[in-house]
UniProtKB/Swiss-Prot annotation:
Annotated TM spans: none
Lineage: Eukaryota, Metazoa, Chordata, Craniata, Vertebrata
Protein's name in the database: Major prion protein
GO molecular function, one term: copper ion binding
Sequence repeats: 51-59, 60-67, 68-75, 76-83
Length: 245
């Protein structure tokens, strides 16, 4: 990782050094640096077209083109273009920033903290797993009633647990408890068979949620290690210096 950061630093130093030299090279004279002047800004003895008296071309008493008494273009008595006494700076108002749908989708995918559950988050919806319980009756019962079981799990961040088993155990307990309370409130009760099947289903979903959260946590940790290495910090500081300077 350190060698990679060093090579990146060497490449960027060489590239930005060339760009810095290009920016500092003097440029040849451009518009209004000694060449012809336009319009009507020649030497005192030079010819000017159109002849300039008290105002511009076609202006008897000064003002813009086609303005008898001064003012903006097409305005007989002053004012900005298309406005009786205002200015053209009032045409547009800054638009209000809109909330990015990508940001909203990203926040939803990361899991929303559930109020009143002590820091638990609700995971995204999953497809209920196909599970075999060892006999035809329970398999058929599960297929017919799987829609009554949770398709989302409650969980806490993985860094609050020492291993996967603790995460899954806590995830199963809180998910079944919340789902049972919600369903019972609606007047529906679960049998022992339902509870047995829910435990299996929720356990599989909690394992999937743990794997997903562990991978995301590892990726965040790897990014922090990369950007905290001394070569990368030096490289970023050098780039900021070149941009600001």
């Amino acid at each position: 990782m350190a060698n990679l950061g060093c090579w990146m630093l060497v490449v960027f130093v060489a590239t930005w050094s060339d760009l810095g030299l290009c920016k500092k090279r003097p440029k040849p004279g451009g518009w209004n640096t000694g060449g012809s002047r336009y319009p009507g800004q020649g030497s005192p003895g030079g010819n000017r077209y159109p002849p300039q008296g008290g105002g511009g071309w076609g202006q008897p008493h000064g003002g813009g083109w086609g303005q008898p008494h001064g003012g903006g273009w097409g305005q007989p008595h002053g004012g900005g273009w298309g406005q009786g006494g205002g200015t053209h700076n009032q045409w547009h108002k800054p638009s209000k920033p809109k909330t990015s749908m990508k940001h909203m989708a990203g926040a939803a995918a990361a899991g929303a903290v559930v109020g009143g559950l002590g820091g638990y988050m609700l995971g995204s919806a999953m497809s209920r797993p196909l599970i075999h319980f060892g006999n035809d009756y329970e398999d058929r019962y599960y297929r017919e009633n799987m829609y009554r079981y949770p398709n989302q799990v409650y969980y806490r961040p993985v860094d609050q647990y020492s291993n996967q088993n603790n995460f899954v155990h806590d995830c199963v307990n809180i998910t079944i408890k919340q789902h049972t309370v919600t369903t019972t409130t609606k007047g529906e009760n679960f049998t022992e068979t339902d509870v047995k099947m829910m435990e299996r289903v929720v356990e599989q979903m909690c394992i999937t949620q743990y794997e997903k959260e562990s991978q995301a946590y590892y990726q965040r940790g790897s990014s922090m290690v990369l950007f905290s290495s001394p070569p990368v910090i030096l490289l970023i500081s050098f780039l900021i210096f070149l941009i600001v300077g």
